[in-house]
UniProtKB/Swiss-Prot annotation:
PANTHER family: 5-OXOPROLINASE SUBUNIT A (PTHR30292:SF0), UNCHARACTERIZED PROTEIN YBGL-RELATED (PTHR30292). GO terms for molecular function: 5-oxoprolinase (ATP-hydrolyzing) activity; ATP binding. It comes from Acinetobacter baumannii (strain AYE). GO terms for biological process: carbohydrate metabolic process. It catalyses: 5-oxo-L-proline + ATP + 2 H2O = L-glutamate + ADP + phosphate + H(+). It comes from the Bacteria. This is 5-oxoprolinase subunit A. Its EC number is 3.5.2.9. Forms a complex composed of PxpA, PxpB and PxpC. It is an enzyme of class 3 (hydrolase).
Amino acid sequence: MFVDLNSDLGESFGSWKMGNDDQILPVVTSANIACGFHAGDPLGILKTVRKAVELGVTIGAHVSYPDLVGFGRRNMDLSRDELIADVLYQISALDGLAKVAGSKVQYVKPHGALYNTIAYDQVQAAAVIDAIKMYNPELVLVALAGSNLVEQARAAGLKVVSEAFADRAYNSDGSLVSRRLEGAVLHDSAFVASRVVSMLKNGGVESIDGVFTPIQADTICLHGDTDGALEMSAAIKAELVKNNIEIRPFVNKA
């Protein structure tokens, strides 16, 4: 049994610091690096890319709606052409920086509101899928486990991996509990680490309503910007190793 660990990185902007990239990168196998639309500036993004290359971490484009003010967490009703152009712009920008650093973008993981919207909105999902195929049809798409997007993207010919979240509560339908609700984000490192192992071994988690909910987890997202994130990430990795679950990139395994 194996699993990939990913995290959202490169999100600092000028003097504003977000996350703990230098501490999280040695833990993960895949880095979802901001492309400047929800967070990140060119210098900071390039530094994160270079550190990822140095550590042998796979690079992915963390594409977003154009929403710096809202950190990409606000829904946007963009036209198909605009969304395609936005996604193409972001992938190509990050891929250019990765090329300079001696690597390349190997997957795409949408961010925030875009991630949540295309999980079920087939129109916007089609625009994102088409943009990825236009740029490089070999890129892997990271999608919410159990969402409509998984099958929609596969039907369109993309490679897809299903993502689960280590520190997020789930509804009984497999969707994430809204961050606005109490209990949406989990903070107990030992509990979360045990939950991740259980998710992988049993193929699901207990929902916020106490119902077993099937979750396929090809990759697990570790948040680097929450309280206790470093402790939690280390605990998860240690628990995986303890249970003989191999940690390796999903690229070429999708």
